[in-house]
A protein has these predicted regions:
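Hydrophobic alpha-helical membrane-insertion segments, chiefly the h-region
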Residues: 18-30
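Collagenous Gly-X-Y triple-helix signature in extracellular proteins
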Residues: 27-445
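N-terminal Sec-pathway targeting helices
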Residues: 2-18
Length: 445
């Protein structure tokens, strides 16, 4: 009896030791893999490591997916916001090298795609990458690009809207998003659907460029006869994600932010940031050695919006019409005139008669204190229902207008619309406070 009891106790002890060993083994494995998937934040050295943490991944619903060595975001509610060089971007995808493709959250301008051209020869590609005498490129507006930006692969496959592939790529510093990538993210049910019209990088067999409609569907009616439509431009760039100078969590309220040291002069700040000047909030358009170009962040107000007709003709002038109001009435209402510089503003023509060539837009200019924006300027879509200074060759009684959803139309001079001024100021004005956002603009001292 005692012998049986002894054997029983030994078996119980063996079982206990076995169970204890299993708990230790599998518990340690669980801790090991948990640490791999969820490293301490202080162990995360680079932006790409933080973004691709295991806890951020999903295989259903909204979130970050990982397939075939590519990470990509899908769905509406995703924390993929990134702030760089004064612009808010969304992270689209990450490749196996740690390169992160970004797209601007907002439209950066609106323009005609091109004149029966492939993306690589289009006006949009030129505006994205190449400076001219008529306009500064989107690339020109970015700071601290050295060592951060890498070339972007833009998918340029021809598509009929049903068979959508991404086999043919064009390499440039700045590109556009493809229909393929738009669909991969969830199309109209994704974070990429911002309720505006904007170009993709693809064309159909008839030479029509595809664009995203305001409801999120993809369309290709980009022209009618000899008339070509202007839609919004959302540039894509690719950054090296193996950087350590960052902060943030990727939410809209606390985006990932790439951090660089900046000076205190106005021209040390980023294009796209906001400044309070003469009690008006302005957005920085250009930062140059000799001047900084600003555009009001909204139409001029006196409690309500001040509305005005363009004038008796579409030539912009300080002597009559909207130009006279801006350079006399509005200018004289400003307290700090000493900081304003004379500026050269384009008042050129843009339509089918010159094949919508944006480089022709500086064939007529006007020098004055206060001007209007033109097609191809940054952030022209921030405000709706106002006049641009861009004319047409076909009629002296028409002028371009910015309407809703990122669309540009040729309108009548006699319509009453908002007034959105632009001006040049001294570059060495000092920043004393503010964070440069629209709600907390920089203040000058």
């Amino acid at each position: 009896m005692k012998k049986r009891l002894k054997i029983k106790n030994i078996l119980i002890l063996i079982n206990i030791l076995f169970l204890l060993g299993c708990c230790i083994f599998y518990g340690s494995r669980m801790i090991h893999y948990y640490r791999i998937e969820n490293p301490k934040i202080e162990d995360v050295k680079t932006l790409v490591e933080l973004v691709t943490l295991g806890k951020n991944l999903t295989d259903n619903g909204d979130g970050l997916y990982h397939e075939n060595d590519i990470y990509y975001y899908k769905g509406k509610n995703v924390n993929n916001y990134l702030l760089y060089s004064g612009r808010l971007f969304r992270i689209v995808s990450i490749d196996k090298s740690g390169y992160m493709k970004l797209i601007t959250e907002e439209l950066q301008t609106s323009m005609v795609w091109g004149y029966n051209q492939e993306f690589e020869n289009s006006y949009v590609r030129n505006w994205l990458n190449d400076d001219t005498d008529s306009y500064k490129s989107f690339l020109h507006s970015l700071d601290n690009t050295q060592g951060l930006l890498v070339n972007t692969n833009t998918c340029v496959d021809e598509t009929d809207g049903k068979t959508i592939t991404c086999d043919k790529n064009y390499e440039s510093t700045v590109g556009l998003l493809s229909v393929y990538e738009y669909n991969l993210a969830g199309a109209s049910d994704s974070y990429l659907n911002i309720g505006s019209y904007w170009w993709t990088s693809n064309k159909d067999s008839d030479g029509n460029a595809w664009y995203v409609y305001k409801k999120g569907t993809v369309n290709n009616d980009s022209s009618s006869g000899y008339t070509y439509y202007s839609y919004g431009v959302r540039p894509t760039i690719t950054i090296n994600g193996k950087i350590s100078n960052f902060k943030g969590t990727g939410t809209k309220e606390d985006p990932y932010e790439i951090i660089f040291d900046k000076g205190k002069n106005l021209n040390d700040q980023y294009v796209g940031e906001y400044i309070l000047f003469n009690d008006i909030v302005w957005r920085i358009q250009e930062t140059e050695e000799k001047y900084v170009k600003l555009a009001s962040s909204d139409g001029i107000k006196d409690k309500d919006y001040i509305l005005a007709k363009y004038g008796p003709k579409n030539m912009y002038s300080a002597d009559y019409g909207i130009g006279n109001y801006l350079n006399v009435t509005f200018y004289n209402s400003l307290k700090d005139k000493d900081s304003i510089l004379l500026g050269v503003f384009n008042n050129g023509k843009y339509d089918r008669t010159n094949k919508y060539d944006l480089s022709k837009i500086n064939e007529y200019t006007v020098t004055c204190n206060i001007g209007l924006l033109q097609i191809g300027d940054l952030f022209i879509n921030d405000v709706e229902k106002y006049y641009l200074a861009t004319r047409t060759l076909t009629s002296d009684n028409s002028i371009y207008q910015v309407l809703e959803d990122g669309k540009i139309y040729i309108g009548n001079l006699k319509e009453e619309m908002k007034i959105r001024p632009t001006l040049h100021v001294k570059p060495d004005l000092k920043i004393v406070s503010g964070s440069g956002t629209k709600d907390d603009p920089y203040k000058l001292g």
